[in-house]
Swiss-Prot record:
Record note on cofactor: Binds 1 zinc ion per subunit.
Keywords: Cytoplasm, Metal-binding, Mitochondrion, NAD, Nucleus, Transferase, Transit peptide, Zinc
Binding site for substrate: 102, 105
Gene name in the database record: SIRT5
Subunit structure: Monomer. Homodimer. Interacts with CPS1. Interacts with PCCA.
Record protein name field: NAD-dependent protein deacylase sirtuin-5, mitochondrial
Functional description taken from the UniProt entry: NAD-dependent lysine demalonylase, desuccinylase and deglutarylase that specifically removes malonyl, succinyl and glutaryl groups on target proteins. Activates CPS1 and contributes to the regulation of blood ammonia levels during prolonged fasting: acts by mediating desuccinylation and deglutarylation of CPS1, thereby increasing CPS1 activity in response to elevated NAD levels during fasting. Activates SOD1 by mediating its desuccinylation, leading to reduced reactive oxygen species. Activates SHMT2 by mediating its desuccinylation.
Keyword Nucleus included in the entry's annotation: yes
Binding site for NAD(+): 58-77, 140-143, 249-251, 275-277, 293
Domain Deacetylase sirtuin-type: 37-307
Organism: Canis lupus familiaris (Dog)
Domain-level remarks: In contrast to class I sirtuins, class III sirtuins have only weak deacetylase activity. Difference in substrate specificity is probably due to a larger hydrophobic pocket with 2 residues (Tyr-102 and Arg-105) that bind to malonylated and succinylated substrates and define the specificity.
Family annotation (PROSITE patterns): SIRTUIN
Family: Belongs to the sirtuin family. Class III subfamily.
Length: 310
């Protein structure tokens, strides 16, 4: 399979080509604007007139469904943080351990449901489509909760827990098996005292394409890997065309996604941030609404009594 390479996008800034944390970039988001507003009525006026809305979502949206974020205090699986296991190097060293981690995450997700934030976004997209308006969701999440909520216009820039990619033939396929292979049944416990399963590589998930049988890996973007250039081209197009942008449940610290909304704001497009706390990018935006996305988004995206305000 050919390695992922960055696309030459207008808006997607050569420095931030792979999945990176702020420590690895040493970069600050550009200087601040005036203090953002929390006036919902003002936001609703802009929302009523917007024709092309981009919603950028992150882990905070799914956290309200009980999805582990593996960030901050207590953000460990066994003794590991996500960035310890979500790398090509970790998979090459110990594919059994990495597959245990992703098996655990897959099994957790099978018990979770979209929350009111996901549902508000999906309902808004469907309603605005009938009005000839467009909503595009660009998510950093790999849990498919937006898809399960009913969102149709969706770019999953970091991949999906429920897709695999063959390390031999490169085939990408949906995979909702539980467990994904017999050897992982009952494995993946997150307890720090749990013993690593040490599953032989031949017993790990394997490609089912005729004549292949190669080792499968999760079809997600790991730290140090480039994002899919075709998806980045789509992101570039959406960010260029949008006339309103929402940033929901994202910490604005993982690049390149951390640059998406500030770049939109820099060209004068209103950006509204919905988050439990401020982020390094908050003062770059027109609005900031603090609180659970499952509470703030249904209010922000609710239908107007008179439909689209002209």
């Amino acid at each position: 399979m050919q390695p992922l390479q960055i696309a030459p996008c207008r808006l997607l800034y050569g420095l931030y080509r792979g999945l990176k944390s702020p420590a690895s970039t040493g970069t600050r988001i550009c200087p601040a604007m005036a203090r953002p507003s929390s006036n919902m009525a003002d936001f609703r006026k802009l929302f009523a007139k917007a024709k092309h809305i981009v919603i950028i979502s992150g882990a905070g949206v799914s956290a309200e469904s009980g999805v582990p974020t593996f960030r901050g205090a207590g953000g460990y699986w066994r003794k590991w943080q996500a960035q310890d296991l979500a790398t090509p190097q970790a998979f090459a060293r110990n594919p059994s351990l990495v597959w245990e981690f992703y098996h655990y995450r897959r099994e957790v997700m099978l018990s979770k449901e979209p929350n009111p934030g996901h549902l508000a976004i999906a309902e808004c997209e469907a309603r605005l489509r009938e009005q000839g308006r467009r909503v595009m969701v660009i998510t950093q999440n790999i849990d498919e909760l937006h898809r399960r909520a009913g969102t149709k216009n969706l770019l999953e820039i970091h991949g999906s827990l429920f897709k695999t990619r063959c390390t031999s033939c490169g085939i990408v396929a949906e995979n909702y098996k539980s467990p994904i292979c017999p050897a992982l049944s009952g494995k993946g416990a997150p307890d720090p005292e749990a013993q690593d399963a040490r599953i032989p590589v031949e017993k790990l998930p394997r490609c089912e394409e005729a004549g292949c049988g190669g080792l499968l890996r999760p079809h997600v973007v790991w730290f140090g890997e480039n994002l899919d250039p075709a998806i980045l081209e789509e992101v570039d197009k959406e960010l260029t065309l949008c006339d309103l942008c929402l940033v929901v449940g994202t910490s604005s610290v993982v690049y390149p996604a951390a640059m998406f909304a500030p770049q939109v704001s820099a060209r004068g497009v209103p950006v509204a941030e919905f988050n439990m706390e401020t982020t390094p990018a908050t003062n770059r935006f027109r609005f900031h609404f603090q609180g659970p996305c499952g509470t703030t988004l249904p209010e922000a995206l609710a239908p107007h009594e008179t439909g689209n305000v002209s």
